[in-house]
Amino acid sequence: HLVQYGRGCRFNCDFCSIKAFYGNYLGQRPIKDVVKEIESLKFKHIFIVDDNIFSYKKQAVEFFKALVPLKVRWSGQVSIDVTQDDELMKLMQKSGCLSVVVGFESLDKKSLIQMKKGWNLRYGGYSEAIKKFRDHGIMVYGTFVHGYDHDNLDSFKYNLEFAIESKFYLANFNPLTPTPGAPLYDRLKKEGRLINDPWWLSPDFKYGQAQFYPKQMTPEELTEGCFKARTEFNSYSNIFKRSLDLKANFSSPYHAAMFLASNLISKREIRKKQVDYL
C-alpha cells in the first residue's frame, strides 16, 4: 500500500523537478488522518511515498512516534543526513522501518557538487551512514545517476562495486534524465545537448534510454552502461553475496523474504523494461 504524509523536499538537486513543481512548499497531512488511513488497511506493510520523509526533523519524529502503536512495517525515501541522529534512527527502527531509498547518486565529489548534492559529503562518508542503517536493521536501496560531465566509463564499475560491497538490499543505476522544470534540463537545452526535445512526448522513448549527449561517453554507452550495471548487480551470485548480511537483509525471516522476493522481481523487471535494442 502507498501512503503519503508530506510533499516537497528541502533540497534543490540539479536533476530533480520537485522544487520546480512545489517551489519551497513543504507540507504534511495531519498525522491523525494518516494514522486513520493506515488503520483502515488490512495489510500493514506500506511504502511512504514522500519525496523525503526527513524534510523536517520535528515532524518526522512526531510521525514515527505515531507509527509505533500501529505495528506497521514500512519503507520510504530519506536523505542521508537522517543517520546523524542516533535517537531518530532508533525511533525509525521501533516504528517499523524495514528499508529506505537513499540517493547516493555518485562516488565522485565533482559530480556531486555539479548536481548540487555536495551535502552528501558532509556526514562522515557513505560507509558510516550505511553502517548506521544496518546497525538498526534497516535495509538500504541505493540509487545512482550516471552521465554528469565528470562521469566516464569507469564510473559504472566503481558505483557497481560499491553497491555490492555495501550489500545494498536493492540498487538502481540510472542514466541522468533531463526532466522538464529541473535546472539540468534548462542547462542541457541551452548547451544544445538534448537528443530529442521534448523527449517525454516521443512515441519512440524507451525506459533507460539516454536523452542527451554526455561529455565523456556516447548516449549509447550511457544507456548500455546503466543496463549492464543493473544486470550485474542482480546476478544470482551477487544476490547471494548481498544476502550475507545478518544485520539487515537477513536479520529476520520477514526481512529475508522481502529481500529475496524484491531481488527476483527486480531481476525480471530489468529485462522486461529495458530498451529492446540492447
Language-model-derived ranges and their functions:
Residues 11, 58, 110-115, 146-154, ...:
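Flexible glycine/acidic-rich beta-alpha junction loops that bind and position SAM and/or redox cofactors
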